[in-house]
């Protein structure tokens, strides 16, 4: 059974004779094909909108844990891409018990409704495959069963989801601009206690572009000092209680200001 397909499609065939015949027909139509074995071994460098997987009788490889083919198919599909599983079940392989012995003996044979049994058998197969598809990230998994000349065909369709909404996709570099905000770039200066004993005050005073010390005059001459609150230059009304500039008039940002150590107690 050859399926009408759209562009950007890959056909995967299991290693069996009926699938080999289909492979030749698809090659005549210039449709890319690959065997299940090669698909699992080779590395593909492109993604497809549609992947069809044909298998005849044998479908147990669909739930092999190691190198799971459904997982690789999902990785090779574009978002919202479609996986189509075409599984042919031979009529003789669908085990259909048609006899049960009556417990009352007398060798009475009871016919079992073969149609109902086949439906249950097919439903069990579909449930197992659906579970494997869900485990590997597929959604919207449906099955359409059709009757062939000597068997039954399961046409299982699954979709590779695109969980990113339009709003999520609209996330742009604007978020990075938030981190480039000038307010975030303000240099943070840790304040030092007046009676510092840990040595932090000494390190701060000796670091370059911080404070110049004039021990003879008992004065601090500030140079390029960055205020921790940013309000020191505005005047006492805007200064905190422990501000070293307390009592000094307002000054221009970046202006050198002398602090008299002798008046520190005042």
From Swiss-Prot:
Residue ranges, annotated region (Fe-S binding site B): 229-243
Positions of region (Linker): 165-185
Motif stretch (Cx2C motif 1): 229-232
The UniProt record lists the keyword Transcription: no
Main localization category: cytoplasm
Keywords per UniProt: 4Fe-4S, Cytoplasm, Iron, Iron-sulfur, Metal-binding, Mitochondrion
GO CC annotations, alphabetized: cytoplasm; mitochondrial intermembrane space
Keyword Nucleus: no
Any GO BP annotation: iron-sulfur cluster assembly
Location within or outside the cell: Cytoplasm; Mitochondrion intermembrane space
InterPro entries linked: Anamorsin (IPR007785), CIAPIN1 (IPR046408)
Region (N-terminal SAM-like domain): 1-164
Sequence positions that bind [4Fe-4S] cluster: 229, 232, 240, 243
Named cofactor requirement(s): [4Fe-4S] cluster
Domain notes from UniProt: The C-terminal domain binds 2 Fe-S clusters but is otherwise mostly in an intrinsically disordered conformation.
Function: Component of the cytosolic iron-sulfur (Fe-S) protein assembly (CIA) machinery. Required for the maturation of extramitochondrial Fe-S proteins. Part of an electron transfer chain functioning in an early step of cytosolic Fe-S biogenesis, facilitating the de novo assembly of a [4Fe-4S] cluster on the cytosolic Fe-S scaffold complex. Electrons are transferred from NADPH via a FAD- and FMN-containing diflavin oxidoreductase.
Family assignment from sequence similarity: Belongs to the anamorsin family.
SUBUNIT field: Monomer.
Annotated HAMAP family: Anamorsin (MF_03115)
UniProt-recorded name of the protein: Anamorsin homolog
